[in-house]
C-alpha cells in the first residue's frame, strides 16, 4: 500500500465516540485519489477544513470511533497546523515558537 494518500474532503462533521467516552470528535469523509471513500480523523485543537479541501491522510485508527481508520496529516496541503502548539509539535504541523 502507501504510507500516505491524498484525497478531497466530501463532508466535514463531528461524531460522538462510543461508551464510556463523551465528546464531539472532528472527522471528515475523504474521496481518495484511488477512488476509495474513507473516514479520517482530524486531530488537534481547531482545524480549517471544509468541503473540497485537499488533505493528506495516514493510517492509524481511532479506537472509540467506529469506522474511522485514518488520520489527516496536519500542516500539509490544505490542512493548517495546530496554532500555539508547544509540545509534540511535529505530529501537528506546528513550527517552533520564537
Curated annotation (Swiss-Prot):
Signal peptide: none annotated. The keyword rRNA-binding applies. It comes from the Bacteria. Keywords: Methylation, Ribonucleoprotein, Ribosomal protein, RNA-binding, rRNA-binding, tRNA-binding. Residues 88-98 have a biased composition (Basic residues). One of its GO terms (molecular function) is rRNA binding. The modification 3-methylthioaspartic acid is found at residue 64. GO terms for cellular component: small ribosomal subunit. Belongs to the universal ribosomal protein uS12 family. Part of the 30S ribosomal subunit. Contacts proteins S8 and S17. May interact with IF1 in the 30S initiation complex. With S4 and S5 plays an important role in translational accuracy. This is Small ribosomal subunit protein uS12. It comes from Eikenella corrodens. The lineage of its organism: Bacteria, Pseudomonadati, Pseudomonadota, Betaproteobacteria, Neisseriales. The gene is rpsL.
